[in-house]
Design a protein with these regions (language model features):
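Extended glycan-interaction surfaces of carbohydrate-active proteins
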Residues: 38-71, 111-203, 236-278
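Extended, well-ordered alpha-helical scaffold segments
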Residues: 9-35, 86-114, 155-169, 219-234
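Short amphipathic alpha-helical "recognition" segments used for binding
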Residues: 7-8, 78, 86, 188, ...
Length: 278
């Protein structure tokens, strides 16, 4: 909003029932994660559970309800992007010291993500078990979110794309991207409803959207273009109405029918891919 409209006043006021501005509320939101969800104080917060992560039944990587155990590489990347957004807001609002603090915090977090979550042998970003300090060796699409965050060294990006993302035996299903690698023992397609919606192999459009932009940022335009094409074909051509998520092998739409949430991102992916709009 600030970037496109220049409306600084909106960030400096808040709802009538709040005593703090929207800008201050956004700062508190980020601080919440570090204050209440980083139990070992290493700068990397944990998900409450797979439900909390939004990937409902990825229990093998994010835990069961109220475990508060697994440091999510995706969560850390989301917070990194929020810190960079706060840096931009602070600059627009003339808060130079705030902007500097957000920039420093973002840089420190990016370093932690690349130090703690990256596995050199496998060439992949894994979550971390805060209790044991060990990586959670589950290949989830969450491991590609660092590409979207823009914090992956080029050589690592190449490994992510060539060894994992575009491998048809892992994530590049008939209608990519699978949210779990095919090599995972609990990989499954279809609307199984064992715990919320199925995120253990199916295709979810917001994941594709973020990965596409990560591919563009790292110079993999051909792969990004192919992903955009396959995604819009899946949503628009293979199904009569937009659905909540999709079977990555058959292309069948799953979940809510006539879903007007994140799945509509598919319709703008080809445009954004060709124009670079983000």
């Amino acid at each position: 909003w600030l970037e496109e409209r220049g409306d600084r006043g909106r960030m400096q006021i808040g709802p009538a029932f709040k005593s703090v501005s929207y800008y201050e509320q956004l700062m508190l939101s980020i601080d919440y994660w570090m204050r209440y969800c980083d139990f070992d104080r290493n700068g990397l917060p944990v998900w409450n559970s797979s439900d909390h992560s939004g990937m409902d039944n990825q229990i093998s990587r994010a835990g069961r309800l109220d475990e508060f155990r697994y440091e999510g590489v995706d969560l850390a990347c989301y917070i990194y992007r929020e810190l960079r957004a706060m840096e931009l807001m602070a600059e627009k609002l003339g808060k130079a010291e705030d902007a500097k603090r957000f920039r420093v915090r973002a840089a420190l977090l990016a370093d932690k993500i690349n130090t703690v979550f990256w596995d050199e042998e496998d060439g992949f970003y894994y979550d971390r078990d805060e209790h044991t300090g060990e990586p959670v060796r589950v290949k989830s699409a969450a491991g590609f979110i660092p590409l979207w965050a823009g914090i992956v060294p080029p050589r690592r990006a190449e490994r992510l794309v060539r060894e994992h993302l575009t491998d048809p035996d892992e994530f590049w299903t008939e209608f990519p991207v699978a949210c779990y690698a095919k090599t995972e023992p609990d990989y499954v397609q279809g609307d199984i409803r064992d715990w919320g919606c199925n995120w253990r192999g199916t295709t979810w459009i917001p994941i594709n959207y973020m990965i596409m932009h990560g591919l563009l940022d790292y110079g993999y335009a051909d792969v990004a273009r192919e992903l955009a094409r396959k995604t819009v074909d899946l949503v628009y051509k293979r199904n009569e109405v937009t659905r909540e998520f999709y079977d990555g092998e058959s292309g069948e739409g799953l979940g809510l029918k006539r879903f007007w949430g994140w799945s509509v991102l598919a319709y703008v992916m080809p445009f954004e891919c060709e124009t670079g709009y983000d």
